[in-house]
Amino acid sequence: MKNKYSTLLILTLAVFANNAKAQETVYPAGPQKGVSAITHATVHVGNGTILTDATILFEKGKITAVGTGVSIPKGATEIDATGKQVYPGLILPSSSLGLREISSGVRGSNDYQEIGENNADIRSIVSYNTDSKIINVLRSNGILLAHVSPSGELIEGRSSVVQLDAWNYEDAEYKANTGMYISMPSLMARRGGRGGFMRGMMMGGGGDPLKAAFDKIETIKTYFIEAKAYCQEKVHANNNLKLEAARALFEGKQKLYVRANEVKQMLLAIDLGKTFGFNIVIVGGGESFQIAGLLADNKIPVILDETHALPASEDDDVDQPYKTPAQLQKAGVLFALNDVSDNSKQRNLSFNAGTAATYGLTKEEALSSITLNTAKILGIDNVTGSIEAGKDANIIISMGDILDMRGNQLTQIFIQGRTVSLDNKQLQLYERYKHKYGIK
């Protein structure tokens, strides 16, 4: 019997050892050493400008020079980009990346949502898991930064921007507490399509959904009224973390991200911003094309949840989600493109931009919608979003057009000047099973 258990133990350890070998061993890169120079590159700056046969110098994680007449210092590490396309690192504008791993009911891998209507004091950054297998997959497709946000019923909590090459959440932190997320209740009597967006609202079959929605809207307003009064007081008998969380909103240091797809939801968001003096960002924007002029007049940016989607309403054109980015661009709305179907599917962010470029945007406008526009909305455009001197060296090099599935073949990526691995779990499995079946 003893020998039987010993044999079983050995077999078990062998299985674990084999599985361990199958796991990726992708480590965060060390700091940049010396000066690096990308030469003979076609540089897509991110602001609409294209430079041909250009050179990019970066040192200590910062871009020091970009142009066609740049002198390369002696001893610099040269990266020949002849025939290649160079872009700013892509930015995922709203995601549960690192908070949610396996969506199909594996609770231990998910930490993106708290119970209750008011979780204003929640900070998503502390739950960010740098060991997520999804991070490397997104990074291999050019996404170098992500805006990580919580989810919830109503007042969801605070978001942060992370860079996708780190050992822990402290290292990953790019900009902490960028804003607060709320989910605007739906004012549709019946749900339908993406326009019936109503995250987390559980209504009984016999209840009045509109009354329930207005009650929840009053809950949001009451919270901000109480938070404003709290923040105006200099001394408090007791600290209230939920009310304190809104202080930066009233001071204009953070933005209020409002999940809203319906026109009525967005109108309520605009009104909320005017009432309390908040900087509002619409997240979703399925029907934003219907009020594009109003959004532009009120300087309300939009994070479009998905381009590869069905229309929000049965009366919309079948290709309306493809056309919405161009319509917002024409109206003068600052917008960014997103992909929210699934964390691993977000690797297709650049292809959403490619579709938008087919339906009215220019290629460089589409690129801006996943780089510089996103950086502006998140308040990080002073350090990233474009390839310009003084900004972080967040750079991707591709064999071809990154907006096209056929051309998006990355050869190198840099995050704050560090040469970052392109390997990921999916690539390793691809190589593993090629080897098994003798495929070259």
Question: Each PLM stretch: what is its role?
Answer:
Residues 41, 56, 61, 83, ...:
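Divalent metal-coordination and catalytic microenvironments
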Residues 2-5, 20-72, 84:
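N-terminal metal-binding scaffold of metallo-dependent hydrolase/deaminase domains
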Residues 8-17:
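Bacterial N-terminal signal peptides
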Residues 53, 149, 230-321, 336, ...:
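Active-site core of metal-dependent hydrolases
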